[in-house]
């Protein structure tokens, strides 16, 4: 199991936090889980509405509301029922199950960063994610083929018509 998951599960246990449905890891911890960058000190989770209602009832003075996104802030945790009013069920699509947690899918994480790209930190995350996608998902054979024509692309402004490469 991932060190990120171990760390989050340990902190949840130490704080006596338990949920009916698996919490969804988002934000910096998800970025670290995928190996894109180190997370900050906070741990962001999205939980089901039912779990949120129980948590909010237990910790009424720890509730937080950001433009209708309701959450509870406990220690290093920010635990939300939605992000940009996108709820647990929406963010759950293609999530990765790890122990007692779920990790938001790469595609949903990317979408969340796009939604917040006016914030400089998230704009940097988008650039990091773009490089991650290129490194992990580009067709390596196509990339090698394209690299043989780099000189032609430079001379032609990036586009070569009719297979007329000018590589020499």
Regions found by a protein language model. Give the residues of each.
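Compositionally biased terminal segments of proteins
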Residues: 1-168
């Amino acid at each position: 199991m991932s060190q990120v998951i171990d760390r989050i599960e340990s902190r949840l246990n130490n704080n006596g936090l338990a949920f009916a449905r698996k919490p969804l890891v988002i934000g910096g911890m998800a970025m670290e889980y995928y190996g894109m960058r180190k997370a900050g000190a906070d741990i962001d989770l999205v939980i089901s509405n039912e779990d949120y209602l129980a948590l909010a009832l237990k910790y009424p003075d720890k509730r937080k509301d950001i433009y209708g996104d309701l959450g509870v802030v406990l220690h290093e945790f920010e635990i939300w029922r939605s992000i940009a009013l996108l709820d647990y069920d929406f963010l759950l699509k293609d999530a990765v199950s790890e122990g007692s947690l779920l990790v938001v899918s790469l595609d949903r994480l990317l979408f969340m960063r796009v939604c917040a790209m006016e914030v400089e930190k998230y704009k940097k995350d988008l650039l990091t994610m773009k490089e991650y996608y290129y490194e992990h998902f580009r067709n390596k054979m196509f990339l090698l083929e394209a690299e043989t024509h780099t000189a032609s692309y430079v001379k032609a402004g990036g586009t070569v018509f009719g297979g007329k490469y000018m590589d020499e």
